[in-house]
């Protein structure tokens, strides 16, 4: 080929585009990505929030650096290191029998660890002939490289700031209608066990994505001893389907009691927004959370 440098650059384009797509997919489904990281129990919830955004920003930066080709060696080694690191992690998941979505492409593309590991190996093979490409020349080269390193992180934090940065703002909202809750309790619409000592009651919808994510969050928080160990009671809004099997299997949560509430009463208590998680003592609400401030 007359221009071998062009051929080497072509082999950088696909990994660069895939890094950008992977980062965008994770950002779109960042709530699921956060909970996925948190579910391993290696990091605190707040650390998981920050780590998720650092991974996304790093992928954006690598994708941009690969395509811009202004510092090819740094971009190449960075991409290889990230793919190799992820591959070791995915290999461990595969060997441990994990077949869940590994969130490599967020929730847009469901890949299990084995499938994602194959994808990473293919990307590494594609990157091999891209080594040694000559950098493009442009004015203000150092400035562009700096911007590609800094802007992605700043943009991710602006578009999706970590929830723990905004707990005080979330705490000012009232996700539960306390009067409607008390009336439902007095009328026997809610289980009598709610007035017996400490209880955690979760107002969920079976198909609600954030209800499922909050359930997964509760599971990990309790495993770490960071959430109430009181009996866990689910109150689902009644719909055509009352089979909780899929919800329980997807989230891994175990309830001590499961109840259903008519839609009008359910929406009145939750102010039309769910999930709502209430901490009770003898029927009195002592703390209440939505998905965002649940910690």
Language-model-detected regions and their locations in the chain:
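Thiol/disulfide oxidoreductase modules built on the thioredoxin-like
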Residues: 263-295
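Functionalized membrane-embedded alpha-helices
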Residues: 7-28, 50-89
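Thiol-/selenol-based redox modules, centered on thioredoxin-like
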Residues: 170-178, 223, 286-295
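Thiol-based oxidoreductase modules, predominantly thioredoxin-like and allied folds used
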Residues: 228-244, 253-263
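Internal/C-terminal transmembrane anchor helices
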Residues: 137-164
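Short active-site neighborhood of thiol/selenol oxidoreductases, capturing the structured segment around
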Residues: 190-212, 218
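Membrane-embedded alpha-helical segments of integral membrane proteins
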Residues: 84-133
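Typically the conserved alpha-helix immediately C-terminal to a functionally engaged Cys/Sec
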Residues: 210-226, 292
């Amino acid at each position: 080929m007359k221009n071998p440098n062009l051929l080497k650059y072509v082999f950088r384009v696909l990994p660069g585009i895939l890094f950008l797509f992977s980062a965008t997919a994770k950002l779109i489904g960042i709530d699921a990505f956060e909970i996925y990281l948190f579910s391993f129990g290696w990091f605190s919830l707040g650390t998981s929030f920050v780590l998720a955004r650092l991974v996304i920003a790093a992928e954006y930066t690598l994708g941009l650096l690969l395509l811009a080709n202004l510092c090819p060696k740094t971009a190449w080694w960075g991409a290889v290191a990230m793919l190799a690191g992820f591959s070791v992690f995915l290999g461990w998941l595969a060997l441990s029998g994990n077949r869940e979505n590994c969130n490599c492409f967020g929730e847009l593309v469901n890949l299990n660890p084995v499938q994602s590991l194959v994808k990473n190996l293919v990307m590494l093979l594609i990157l091999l002939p891209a080594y040694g490409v000559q950098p493009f020349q442009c004015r203000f080269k150092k400035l562009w490289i700096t911007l590609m390193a800094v802007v992605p992180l700043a943009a991710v934090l602006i578009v999706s700031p970590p929830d723990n940065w905004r707990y005080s703002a979330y705490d000012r909202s009232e996700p539960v209608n306390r009067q409607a809750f008390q009336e439902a309790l007095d009328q026997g619409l809610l289980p009598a066990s709610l007035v017996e000592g400490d209880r955690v009651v979760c107002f969920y919808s079976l198909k609600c994505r954030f209800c499922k994510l909050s359930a997964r969050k509760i599971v990990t928080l309790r495993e770490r001893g960071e959430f109430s160990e009181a009996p866990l009671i689910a109150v689902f809004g009644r719909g055509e389907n009352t089979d909780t099997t899929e919800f329980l299997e997807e989230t891994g949560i175990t309830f001590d009691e499961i109840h259903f509430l008519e839609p009008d009463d359910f929406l009145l208590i939750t102010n039309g927004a769910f999930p709502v998680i209430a901490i009770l003592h003898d029927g009195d609400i002592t703390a209440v959370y939505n998905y965002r401030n649940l910690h």
